[in-house]
Amino acid sequence: MKHLGIFYKPELFGKAESLKELLLNEGYIVDYCESSERIKNNKVDLTIVLGGDGTFLKASHLVNNPLVGFKGGRLGFLSSYTVEEFDKFLKDLKNNNFVSDERTFLKVSDLNTFCLNEVLLVKDPDQKMVDIKISFQDGELFFHADGIMLSTPTGSTGYSLSLGGPILLPNTKAFVITPVAPQFLASRSIVIPDNEKVNIEVDKRVNLIIDGVNFGKFSKITVMKSKKKISILRPVDYDFTKSIKEKLGYGKKIL
């Protein structure tokens, strides 16, 4: 990997410039060092992302090459290093000491738009609760709630988890459907195979939010697994369970 790009959260400009200088001194070609969407469709061997999971999500929608993340936010589930580990990264880069953590996207067919984390249909604060119908090959589900979320395994440690959804291992071939503030306590998340095509109908037009971006008002969408994938480079000693123990305290040994 010789041609590299850097995409960074604006607050991390200084860190991005420091990394750029380190890479140039090691003989790498840094094709861009940007915090804007000007990186879109730039062809490099690897895009380095400095920021939180939000910055990483944004980068995943702009480029098609492998990504490696440096944590500059709170949790950083998508990050492989911290912004204090440039030396460790350079050593791994020289020795190609990485494994590929491949992640799949969802596709919202109505918009031809892709999703790495979650698709959310949710009412405005001043709206009443809505009736939601979800249909797929194995049947139908109905919810009276503020909204509904479909999450990928990648998104299962994000907003979906805050709604009470389960954590999915990254290579799980499934996604999670979770109601938002349902009226009935029995309404819980359901995990379905990722080969299902999911049709969602809401009795009112509500906000469609994909990976944190609001696409306007919709009352009906179709969501399915996309052929689009992205490769996240991890150090060979990366351990997902260690990550959730450290960041969430989940499954951590107490005694």
UniProtKB/Swiss-Prot annotation:
Protein EC: 2.7.1.23
Keyword Kinase found: yes
Compartment(s) of residence: Cytoplasm
One BP term from GO: NADP biosynthetic process
Cofactor: a divalent metal cation
Main localization category: cytoplasm
Class of enzymatic activity (EC top level): transferase
Gene Ontology MF terms: ATP binding; metal ion binding; NAD binding; NAD+ kinase activity
Signal peptide range in chain numbering: none
Known function: Involved in the regulation of the intracellular balance of NAD and NADP, and is a key enzyme in the biosynthesis of NADP. Catalyzes specifically the phosphorylation on 2'-hydroxyl of the adenosine moiety of NAD to yield NADP.
Name of the protein this chain belongs to: NAD kinase
Organism: Thermosipho africanus (strain TCF52B)
Lineage, highest ranks first: Bacteria, Thermotogati, Thermotogota, Thermotogae, Thermotogales
Gene name linked to the record: nadK
